[in-house]
Regions:
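Extended, highly charged
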Residues: 12-235, 247, 260, 270-271, ...
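Single conserved hydrophobic/aromatic residue that forms the stacking wall/gate
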Residues: 1-7, 11
Length: 418
């Protein structure tokens, strides 16, 4: 993290809202420049340099975990000259242009305000991607070639110019300050406000901003990105689990573009049974990390155990593998269902990791209601004709209208339609 206390203090004093972006940049400028210099020294590269560039990610650092609520920007520092420097440095043109097109899209969405805000809006970047994939006769983003990715960058920047009236920023520090202020702004986005209201998190806490040197999971077949949990967040079972994707980055794991693979062999076999995939096809096309990257898996498994023992709670972790080397991006106490909350607290107590008082404090009264939700009869579930499968956002079983947009759900609920 480049800075946290200064950023949090700025928000606590409401200076960001009252003084505006320019004043905030002035207040934080010296601290950020010094911290960037320190990261440059550690990474032996230079921010904005053409020959030996440092790329960074910019993400939130709120004191309370708010998974998925705040905005993140990856690959910051790229422009038309820097991307050529990355190619010269790595010898991997596809990786460089793939990172560039991801950056322009993410920056356009988060910083330049081009992300759709309602169901009527069309995402200009996704529309362009689908158009290019269709013209090239491919289905997946990772099937696009270097020339296709170059075309995407060109069309993305044209879309930015058309929608904002300005050229896409090329100065690394201009990009950085835009991203920092966008993360501050995301503290007050609608989903973050609603999440804080549900979780009882005060608005005045604010968020810090973390700027980290990039590591890349999209450098080829020896690279990957993933998320994992030291215990099952749904049931509380003491079972290491998670998902990963080879040659991918950031939100690819949860974006639904490609089918993620399981971290453990047991998890992969469980997934295959639920998905109706034979063992031969699973092993050939969807191997677990334990099978495909055994040495990385052993290191990851050892580290997740070490982290849980240190924090004495179930951990939610994000990681990247860059050309065979494992990097941890973050760890936090994982969110869990009511049933998992009780089981994890009791298991940690029995395992001697926490005492009775701590176990009781881990049980949130408002989540006990989840234990009373109706559930499917297991025997009936086995006989059910399943139309599709997915990851549940809440516990229990439900019947009713399928709703694809949050606005529709709120509107229909107000009209007593659901």
């Amino acid at each position: 993290p480049l800075y946290s206390s200064a950023a949090s203090d700025v928000y606590k004093r409401q200076e960001y809202n009252t003084l505006g972006r320019d004043k905030v940049v002035e207040l934080l400028k010296d601290e950020v420049v010094k911290a960037i210099a320190r990261v440059e020294e550690l990474m032996k590269s230079k921010f904005g340099d053409i020959e030996n560039p440092l790329l960074v990610s910019v993400r939130s650092g709120a004191r309370a975990s708010m998974p998925g609520m705040m905005d993140t920007i990856l690959n910051l520092g790229l422009n038309d000259e820097v991307v050529e420097g990355i190619i010269r440095k790595t010898g991997n043109a596809r990786f460089a242009w793939d990172s560039y097109r991801r950056f322009v899209q993410m920056y356009g969405d988060v910083v330049l305000g081009m992300k759709p805000t309602n169901k009527e809006d069309i995402d200009p970047f996704e529309a362009i991607i689908e158009e290019v994939k269709e013209s090239k006769g491919v289905k997946l983003d990772n099937e696009l070639e270097v020339a296709d990715l170059q075309e995407l960058v060109k069309k993305f920047k044209a879309a930015v110019k058309e929608q904002t009236g300005k050229d896409f920023p090329t100065c690394a520090y201009e990009q950085l300050w835009g991203a920092i202020c966008a993360v501050f702004d995301s503290w007050m986005n609608e989903r973050a406000i609603l999440y804080r209201k549900m979780e009882g998190i005060p608005d005045e806490w604010g968020t810090a901003v973390n700027v980290q040197a990039m590591v890349f999971g999209n450098m080829g077949d020896t690279s990957a990105t993933g998320v994992c949990f030291s215990r099952d967040a749904g049931t509380g079972e003491d079972l290491f689990n998670g998902e990963y994707l080879i040659n991918a980055q950031g939100e690819d794991v949860v974006a639904g573009i490609r089918t993620p693979q399981q971290i453990t062999k047991v998890g992969s076999q469980r997934w295959a049974v639920l998905a109706g995939v034979t063992e031969d096809i699973r092993a050939a096309k969807f191997p677990s990390m334990e099978e495909a990257m055994p040495e990385i898996y052993k290191e990851l498994d050892a580290l997740q155990t070490k982290l849980e023992n240190h924090y004495k709670d179930m951990q939610d972790m994000e990681f990247t593998v860059q050309e065979g080397k494992l990097w941890f991006l973050q760890t936090r106490n994982g969110k869990r269902t009511g049933a998992a909350m009780v089981k994890i607290a009791m298991d940690l107590l029995r395992q001697g990791m926490i005492d009775e008082k701590t176990a009781l404090m881990r049980v949130e009264p408002n989540k006990l209601d989840e234990l009373l939700h109706p559930v499917f009869d297991k025997s009936a579930l086995k006989q059910a004709k399943v139309l599709t499968r997915g990851l549940p956002a809440s516990p229990g079983a439900a019947t009713g209208q399928i709703v694809f947009f949050a606005d529709d759900a709120a509107e229909w609920h107000a009209l007593s339609l659901i």
